[in-house]
Amino acid sequence: MNTFKKAVAGSLFLAVTLASQAHAEDASCATVTLGDPGWSDIAVTNGIASLVLDGLGYDVKTQTLGVPIIFAGLQKGQVDVFLGNWMPAQQANYDKFVASGAVDKVAENLSGTEYTLAVPTYAYDAGVKSFADLNKYADKFGHKIYGIASGAPANESIKEIIAANEFGLKDWKLVESSEQAMLVQVGRAVKRDEFVVFLGWTPHPMNVQYDMKYLKGGEKYFGDSGSVNTLARKGYAAQCPNVGKLLSNLKFTQDMENAIMDQVLSKQASNDQAVKDWLKANPEVIDNWLKGVTTREGGDALAAVKAKL
């Protein structure tokens, strides 16, 4: 082989080697474990991630856990990815695990969120426009605030408000339950035109299902307009660069999540089917998610994922 041929052969070998290394991942990357706190919006985003990862040739496991346990799982390497780091609601957990360097922030996946106490519009129109107004109507509310599952950061904020007698709420009680049970209580109260105060957030179909308003004055505990981050166990994106690239690309919109959640909560489709139907109707979003991403074996990611739809 002459010098020129050797040079060409060497260049080709190097190119193939580098391409292989670019997509090479540790064997442990074959299975991706997602944390799920049991919320409708994260069921949607986990469903999207699962469908895409499955198309790329990865196995996906979902662990349904409380938020504090998900953070601890990320720190211990028992959970790979969490798509539901709502900020600033989870600021304390973020500071403890992410800001300290124990868990990695990969990207912001959603912006413009709202997360605070809410009331039906008829209660708002009657004078309950802020946290400071709640205790004026304590009897109508039954001295109760309806929250979500125990351990949720928002519940802890409500407990802090009550313990500190903020807004005169020391005699109030937080009722903890699942998201679904909370919304059943809200629906029951709305049918009877009764006062009810509960934890509300966007995106969520509750904003369409109920004529509701968010209360002002709780910014100290719930912050202003927020965002949602994608987190991963420390070093995960470097260890599993192909998955890491996908995670950094995954961006959602409120309209997207609301549309899918509405299909699920109105029982028109399962979560997996609603995700698939929405992506079939909006395939252009997949193009951006898969930029710089391949299948696990280094193949055409776009073709593989669209074949799953």
Locate the predicted segments by residue.
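A conserved helix-loop-strand patch within extracytoplasmic ligand-binding domains
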Residues: 102-151
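Ligand-binding cleft/hinge of the Venus flytrap
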Residues: 49-56, 138-172, 280
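A bilobed periplasmic-binding-protein/Venus flytrap-type ligand-binding module shared by bacterial periplasmic
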Residues: 114-124, 226-239, 263
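Pocket-flanking alpha-helical
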Residues: 46, 63-101, 181-185, 204-211
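Immediate post-signal peptide segment of exported/extracytoplasmic ligand-binding proteins
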Residues: 23-33, 53-54, 136-142, 287-289, ...
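Gram-negative bacterial Sec-dependent N-terminal signal peptides
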Residues: 1-23
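Short, well-ordered beta-strand elements
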Residues: 26-41, 58-63, 142-146, 247
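Ligand-binding pocket segment of bilobal, Venus flytrap-like solute-binding proteins
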Residues: 79-83, 153-220
